[in-house]
Regions:
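Helical segment within the ABC ATPase nucleotide-binding domain
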Residues: 114-127
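Conserved catalytic motifs of ABC-family nucleotide-binding domains
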Residues: 95
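ABC ATPase nucleotide-binding domains
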Residues: 175-257
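Conserved ABC ATPase signature
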Residues: 48-49, 74-78, 82
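ABC ATPase NBD Q-loop/coupling interface
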Residues: 1-12
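Conserved ABC ATPase "signature" region
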Residues: 37, 52-72
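Catalytic Walker B motif of ABC-type/P-loop ATPase nucleotide-binding domains
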Residues: 99-103
Length: 259
């Protein structure tokens, strides 16, 4: 808006930006609906009364986070995952131009993580809301973010498009990975390779070898894998876990030398 934040009144600031923190808030005798309705504070009069329009926005916000069924529940008695969804609904209820979220996927199961990311994506694309999120799950950041900022322990900052910033080498360096690997393309983590002389050869391919590779890793059995084309979906996991991977270049027939 071309103005300093310090020039905003508290209500102007609240209409512009909403925040969702991981810190738990303590409430007494407040339903989930009451907590969400707090997001309408910047728009209410001196007495804080909600209009019919406000009530509609509260219901829409609850519906957006799939929380209408717990709207009348005591906020202090719901689970951490439900609490996170209610706090997001409160932020949505403010109708902000900017929303800042601190690890919003904490305490959420996979279904509600996906739903939350869908909501944030919709807010950014359809409602033109600037969404700023702090995440430890880089695999989620890679899928949803237009731009990412990585901050290392030494304070070094990397900023840019996910496909430019999230590389295997950079992530290994950023997190100091020494026990295992992270595959940026698939957003998957593999534990360290089993040590010792390989006693097993796994003939996989087309996804048939992945679960066997991981089971052998859990059992601590070193193994070889192949013959895999370099574009086979088994290849990244085999490369991370196998002592040796016998490969062939993609789109080429398996040659005699490979055997």
């Amino acid at each position: 808006k071309g103005r300093k934040i310090s020039d905003f009144t508290s209500k102007e600031y609240a209409k512009t930006m909403s925040v969702v923190l991981t810190e738990k808030i303590k409430t007494e005798m407040m339903t989930c609906r009451d907590v969400v309705a707090m997001g309408r504070y910047p728009y209410t009069n001196y007495f804080g009364r909600l209009t019919k329009e406000d009530e509609v926005i509260v219901n829409e916000s609850l519906k957006k986070v799939s929380a209408l069924d717990i709207a009348e529940n005591d906020f202090s008695q719901i689970s951490d995952g439900q609490r996170q969804r209610i706090m997001l609904a409160r932020a949505i209820c403010q109708k902000p131009e900017v929303i800042v979220l601190d690890e919003p996927t904490s305490f959420l199961d996979i279904r509600h993580k996906i739903e939350l990311l869908d909501i944030l994506q919709e807010m950014a694309v359809k409602d033109n809301v600037a969404v700023i999120v702090s995440l430890h799950e880089i695999e989620l950041a890679a899928k949803i973010a237009d731009y990412v900022m990585c901050v290392g322990a030494d304070g070094k900052i990397e900023f840019g498009r996910p496909e430019k910033i999230f590389t295997d080498d950079r992530i290994s360096s950023l997190y100091g990975l020494t026990h295992g690997t992270y595959n940026c393309m698939y957003g998957s983590t593999e534990l360290k390779k089993p040590e010792g002389t390989p006693k097993v050869f796994v003939a996989g391919g087309a996804g048939t070898g992945v679960f066997i590779y991981r089971e052998l890793q859990r059992l601590g059995i070193a193994f070889r894998a192949g013959i895999l084309y370099e574009n086979d979906c088994d290849f990244p996991v085999a490369k991370a876990l196998a002592s040796e991977v016998i490969t062939e270049k993609m789109f080429e027939p398996i040659g005699k030398d490979t055997f």
